[in-house]
Design a protein with these regions (language model features):
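Donor nucleotide-sugar binding/catalytic pocket of nucleotide-sugar-dependent glycosyltransferases
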Residues: 118, 147-197
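Short hydrophobic "strand-cap" motifs at the C-terminus of beta-strands
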Residues: 8, 170, 210-213
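Membrane-proximal helix-turn-helix segments that form the acceptor-binding/catalytic region
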Residues: 29, 85-92, 126-130, 139-167
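Conserved catalytic-core segment of nucleotide-activated headgroup transferases in glycan assembly
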Residues: 187, 191-220
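A short, charged, and often flexible helix/loop element on the N-terminal side
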Residues: 60-87, 139-146
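Active-site proximal beta-strand in glycosyltransferases
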Residues: 114-137
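N-terminal subdomain of nucleotide-sugar transferases
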Residues: 1-61, 93-94
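Short N-terminal targeting/anchoring amphipathic segment
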Residues: 88-107, 118-120
Length: 220
């Protein structure tokens, strides 16, 4: 069994404070516990590098997103903006397996720049549907156009990429969607720290925020 693994993450997975980073972070914790050496590759935009990640990884690399990818008319922005040449160079230093987290990190797979590599994809959801929902709820006309355009590009992109490698879906619904795209799809539930409850002792007043309220879909 190979004890080394590259993991590509579309964001910095610490702090684990929203849905897109909870599963990636606690996967790092679990892999560390069973002796897997992880080479973590993160894209930065609004989140800074985190020393905490070094506790669980052999190496941690950070890459800036390319905002000029907005000019692309053929590829989704969430994918094209994560096409760092430095990342491709790091992946080429060895032949370790690769776990791509989120359709966001699949640019080099799509471009067939990783031949003869063992690769798995862990999509966070069906992104084309997610962006369609964002477009339907958006009031700002420019953002609405962007979300609608992104959804259209993602729909064809997801269909093509999902047939290239095995899919590790987060939900049974997503598993079924990718199976309908002729993908080899498997269901692995979200990884969370279920072994313990992290809560302050005693009683008090609490406010529960279920989801990121800066996203229109969560406000709805």
């Amino acid at each position: 069994m190979d004890k080394n693994l590259h993991i590509l993450c579309p964001d910095v997975p610490w702090p684990a404070d929203y849905g897109g980073v909870i599963d990636p972070f606690y996967l790092l914790v679990q892999l560390k516990a069973v002796g897997i050496q992880v080479y973590l590759h993160c894209f930065t935009q609004n989140r800074a590098p985190q020393k905490e990640l070094e506790k669980y990884c052999k190496e941690v690399h950070y890459y800036r997103r390319d905002k000029t990818a907005l000019l692309s008319n053929t590829l989704p922005y969430i994918v094209k903006s994560r096409s760092s040449k430095k990342l491709l160079q790091e992946l080429g230093k060895n032949n370790y397996p690769i776990l791509m987290q989120g359709i966001h990190t699949t640019y080099f797979l799509y471009k067939k720049l990783l031949p003869n590599r063992k690769i798995l994809l862990r999509p966070f959801n069906v992104e084309s549907t997610y962006y369609q929902q964002l477009s339907a709820l958006e009031i700002n006309p420019f953002k609405k156009y962007f979300f609608k355009r992104e959804s259209r590009l993602l729909k064809s992109y997801e269909k093509e990429v999902s047939t290239m490698i095995p899919i590790l879906a987060l939900s049974q619904t997503d598993k079924q969607f990718f199976e309908e795209q002729n993908a080899r799809s498997y269901f692995i539930p979200v990884i969370i720290p279920w072994q313990e409850v992290s809560i302050l002792p005693g009683t008090g007043n609490y406010c529960l925020y279920h989801g990121n309220l800066s996203v229109n879909e969560n406000q709805k």
